[in-house]
């Protein structure tokens, strides 16, 4: 499922004394089966774009096209509902949205809300809970009895149970320790390898380098760079000027260059750095 934004602008609280422009004439494509990352400083417009992709916001001007279905300023909620089924949105700290009395019921709620039978919804819930690493002995537990990391996995399973074709992740590993973050990113990697389109908002440049295949860089509501991670992270000075930084190995390689060691193309992953050091 591909997504396209054409001349999209968005204004919060339009027509009030508090109105503020969040996006300016955004044009972008998210290709079917891609792993696209959005990076930018706080207030750059990343989260607004995520909510446009899912239909939580409609554009003030322009068109958001999801699998050739257009969302405009005049779109009605019933027209957008099918898009929300196909584009799953995982907010920061999604565990805050858990509410059912058991883990299984919570994950099954979403598909039932879209008209799936209780039996099929339970089967989907069991499948997706297993996918995110929640063992069956936890299915009848109250979600709030679980650890923070487990609660987050349950919340993500609830999104996956609705069988989206696109998974939009807004800082999905926020607050997790390195082990928990790596485990969660590995789950998303496997989903991508299975054919799901992944959209990631993150401030962790190492995750962008290791997982994404395309990157958009936002600043003050505008796209200032776009391209493959390898290309984007060559722009060290610009990214640092925008307070974004680069992957750790890229920063190390740049220091070597600054000391006179020739490196034709800065590495962005540990594997690339090893190759650079090996071949000189």
From Swiss-Prot:
Which molecular function GO terms apply here? ATP binding; ATP hydrolysis activity; ATPase-coupled transmembrane transporter activity
- Binding of ATP, residues: 40-47
Q: What is its EC number?
A: 7.-.-.-
Q: What class of enzyme is it?
A: translocase
Record-level GO cellular component terms: ATP-binding cassette (ABC) transporter complex
What membrane topology does this protein have? Peripheral membrane protein
Work out whether the entry's keyword set contains DNA repair.
no
Entry keyword set: ATP-binding, Cell membrane, Membrane, Nucleotide-binding, Translocase, Transport
Q: Mostly located where?
A: membrane
Its annotated function is as follows: ATP-binding (A) component of a common energy-coupling factor (ECF) ABC-transporter complex. Unlike classic ABC transporters this ECF transporter provides the energy necessary to transport a number of different substrates.
Q: What is this protein called?
A: Energy-coupling factor transporter ATP-binding protein EcfA2
């Amino acid at each position: 499922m591909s997504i396209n934004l054409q001349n999209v602008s968005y204004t919060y609280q339009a027509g009030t004394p508090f109105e503020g422009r969040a996006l300016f004439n955004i044009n972008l494509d998210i290709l079917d089966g891609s792993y696209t990352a959005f990076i930018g400083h706080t207030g750059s417009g990343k989260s607004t774009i995520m909510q446009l992709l899912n239909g939580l916001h409609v554009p003030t001007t322009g068109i958001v096209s999801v699998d050739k279905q257009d969302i405009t300023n005049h779109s009605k909620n019933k027209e957008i509902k099918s898009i929300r089924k196909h584009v799953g949105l995982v907010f920061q700290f999604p565990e805050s949205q858990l509410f059912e009395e058991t883990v299984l019921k919570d994950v099954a709620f979403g598909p039932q809300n879209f008209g799936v039978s209780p039996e099929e919804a339970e089967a989907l819930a069991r499948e997706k809970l297993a996918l995110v690493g929640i063992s069956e002995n936890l299915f009848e537990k109250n979600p709030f009895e679980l650890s923070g990391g487990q609660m987050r996995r349950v919340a993500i399973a609830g999104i996956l149970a609705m069988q989206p074709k696109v998974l939009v992740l807004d800082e999905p590993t926020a607050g997790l320790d390195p082990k928990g973050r790596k485990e969660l990113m590995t789950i998303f990697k496997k989903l991508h390898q299975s054919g799901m389109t992944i959209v990631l908002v993150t401030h962790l440049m190492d995750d962008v380098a290791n997982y994404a295949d395309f990157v958009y860089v936002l600043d003050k509501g505008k796209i200032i760079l776009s391209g493959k991670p390898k290309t984007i992270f060559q722009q060290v000075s610009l990214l640092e000027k925008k307070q974004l930084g680069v992957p750790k190995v890229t920063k190390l390689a740049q220091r070597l260059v600054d000391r006179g060691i020739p490196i034709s193309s800065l590495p962005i992953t540990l594997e690339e750095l090893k190759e650079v050091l090996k071949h000189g």
